[in-house]
Amino acid sequence: MTTTSKQDRIAELIRQATVIPVLTIERLADAVPLAKALVAGGVRTLEVTLRTAVAVDAAKAIIAEVPDAVVGIGTILNADDLARAEALGAKFGISPGATPELLKAVAASGLPFAPGIATASELMQALAHGFDVVKFFPAEQAGGIKALRALAGPFPNVRVCPTGGIGEANAAIWLAEPNVLAVGGSWLCPAADIRASNWAGITAMCAKAMKTLKAG
């Protein structure tokens, strides 16, 4: 798969998602019921971050037991993380930032991928390696929608998934931007609800959010 076709593939995955929940799973036992709760609420595209000791096993379990979930791996920082994501059978990968080494490794891999950027220079580096679908991170902290619009001036064809500081109150505002494919965030799976195994609450929250955001 060429870099262009991989970028088109991840663009379509992200566009179909509307919202990509960023999952930091602390307990392996939570992985499958959490994924099932999200899918039941209409949220199928999931980013499992490599931030915990159980992340790899959690992603494996979701891929094996929740076939309706489209599982990607987030917090990919280097070629070793990338190899883990590919070995798991992830459908896509996401990074919070990007080094030249990581971009080269991804370009040589078969994994659809969105590197993280926060500045024009970082975006130019991503584009130089063939990546025009990117994660804008941390979105609010890096200047918010004003910063995104400023980047869209010289880079009108870049497609973006903003993540960081996005929640129920501002998701629709971000999604209204013409270069935004979807938004990422953790508000659909609050840590307190996960700890309490409040799967029904998570499903209800997802269903409400998807109805509201897709209507907009």
Language-model features and meaning:
Residues V19-L23, L46-V48, V71-G74, G93-I94, ...:
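Hydrophobic faces of well-ordered beta-strands that scaffold small-molecule active sites
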Residues S121-E122, H129-D132, V180, G201-C206, ...:
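Ligand-binding grooves and catalytic loops that recognize ribose/phosphate and carbohydrate rings
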Residues Q125, Q141, K146-G167:
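Shared catalytic-loop signature of beta/alpha-barrel
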Residues P96-V133, F137-A142:
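Histidine/lysine/aspartate-rich catalytic loop segments that bind and position anionic ligands
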Residues F92-L102, K135-I145, P178-G201:
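Glycine-rich phosphate-binding active-site loops on the catalytic face of alpha/beta enzymes
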Residues M1-K91, A108, N157, E168-A169, ...:
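Conserved N-terminal beta1-alpha1 strand-loop-helix module at the mouth
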Residues R9, A58, D80-D81, E101-L102, ...:
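Short acidic active-site motifs
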Residues L34, N78-L88, S121-H129, I166-A182:
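Catalytic cores of alpha/beta
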